[in-house]
């Protein structure tokens, strides 16, 4: 156990981190292009934030939260989702007093949920999330959907489907609750135990249940779209017009309710088809009452979350190649007793802001090693005379490798013992 990561967690190893960095850079770029600024909130919050914000009838609160008492006897919870913490930060720091809308994103935020680990879903996973506060119009909903769609398309994800729904508001949802209770009332015995316990307080949770028997029970259930109030109906129609105008294909799925109680009006999912079936890669919606519920002013908001592990898994399964960056700008080798001279050269190059690695020449005895290390320049610190000629012959093969692979730009430096200073050729300053 000592040398094993806890179940449901995973290490990102040095040889794999470039993949994360590439995806994260694309996410940052997409957020910045749309005017979102980064927010970083604590990895844990007071438990009450999630009880009030996420909803005490959700799977997250009832089954999945990592909650504990700290040494001050305060109930603390590791963050199970990103929105509640972002809203808390907005309220605590009165960010709503600035110009609206207030647009923020979080990236590589660790999320903790105690659930059965599966491919693309871990107990600790990382999210990219966007939150837009103070935007009432459905154009904000459309903007986030389009941003997620274009980001995933840029990353090479294919077969994307945009699924949308409206789950109404406090004005029209009670009517739907009554309809759903009437429809499911004679079917309670067929529900799972969790849905039975939630049925009276929040029958919508039955629609979100992953148990097959519950999914069968609700497949012919009435649709919320049939009882939307005029405001919700107009908002949903407006969203569809924006998506159509942007040329983004979408479909209406009245079964989407998402797993969080704070959603109102728009909910959406971006789904892709894989060899193993449908995979939800992004989900979100509008939450017009959450800011007020947490203690702020009445402020409309919309957001989404996207799992980074799931995006990377999807890219792997579709064979999408992520460009590997050059590991070293300059690679210094040395022969014989020239370790000190090589060390001095490395430090001078680092001051000049070159990515650098110093290694004994004996460790670089294969041409393929130069390619594997993604080296731009190879620097050899050596004596003049026979050793120099011998090593040049060795490096000639690497020059051939350069022409074959385009991986190495070869540069030779000659360090001379006896007070001569090591010079840096112009070619070394090439990036």
Labelled PLM ranges:
Residues 1-353, 358:
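TRNA-recognition modules of translation machinery and tRNA-sensing kinases, especially anticodon-binding
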Residues 351-431:
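Intrinsically disordered, low-complexity segments enriched in glycine and mixed charged residues
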């Amino acid at each position: 156990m000592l040398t094993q990561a806890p179940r449901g967690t995973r290490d990102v190893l040095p040889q794999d981190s470039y993949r994360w960095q590439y995806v994260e850079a694309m996410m940052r770029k997409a957020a910045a292009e749309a005017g979102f600024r980064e927010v970083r909130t604590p990895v844990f919050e007071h438990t009450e934030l999630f009880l009030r914000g996420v909803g005490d009838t959700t799977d997250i609160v009832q089954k999945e939260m990592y909650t504990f008492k700290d040494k001050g006897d305060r109930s603390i919870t590791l963050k199970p989702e990103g929105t509640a913490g972002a809203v808390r930060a907005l309220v605590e720091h009165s960010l709503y007093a600035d110009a609206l809308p207030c647009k923020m994103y979080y990236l590589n935020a660790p999320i903790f949920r105690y659930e059965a680990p599966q491919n693309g879903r871990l107990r600790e996973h990382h999210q990219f999330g966007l939150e837009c506060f103070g935007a009432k119009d459905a154009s904000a909903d459309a903007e986030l959907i389009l941003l997620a769609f274009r980001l995933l398309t840029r990353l090479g994800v294919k077969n994307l489907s945009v699924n949308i729904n409206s789950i109404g508001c406090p004005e029209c949802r009670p009517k739907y609750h009554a309809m759903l209770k009437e429809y499911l009332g004679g079917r309670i015995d067929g529900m799972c135990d969790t849905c039975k316990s939630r049925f009276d307080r929040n029958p919508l949770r039955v629609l979100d249940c992953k148990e097959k028997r519950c999914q069968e029970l609700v497949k012919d259930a009435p649709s919320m779209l049939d009882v939307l109030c005029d405001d919700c109906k107009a908002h949903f129609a407006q969203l569809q017009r924006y998506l159509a105008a942007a040329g983004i294909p979408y479909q209406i799925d009245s079964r989407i309710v998402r797993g969080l109680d704070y959603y109102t009006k728009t909910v959406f999912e971006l789904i892709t088809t894989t060899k193993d079936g449908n995979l939800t890669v992004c989900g979100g919606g509008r939450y017009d009452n959450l800011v007020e519920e947490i203690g702020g002013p009445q402020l409309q908001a919309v957001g989404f979350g996207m799992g980074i592990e799931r995006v990377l898994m999807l890219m792997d399964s579709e064979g999408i190649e992520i460009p590997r960056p050059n590991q070293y700008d300059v690679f210094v080798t040395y022969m014989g007793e020239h370790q000190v001279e090589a060390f001095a050269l490395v430090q001078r190059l680092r001051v000049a802001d070159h990515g650098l690695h110093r290694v004994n020449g004996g460790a670089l005895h294969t041409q393929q090693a130069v390619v594997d290390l993604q080296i731009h320049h190879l620097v050899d610190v050596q004596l003049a005379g026979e050793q120099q000629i011998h090593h040049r012959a060795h490096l000639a093969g690497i020059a051939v490798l350069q022409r074959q692979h385009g991986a190495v730009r070869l540069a030779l430096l000659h360090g001379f013992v006896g007070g001569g200073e090591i010079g840096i050729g112009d070619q070394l300053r090439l990036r």
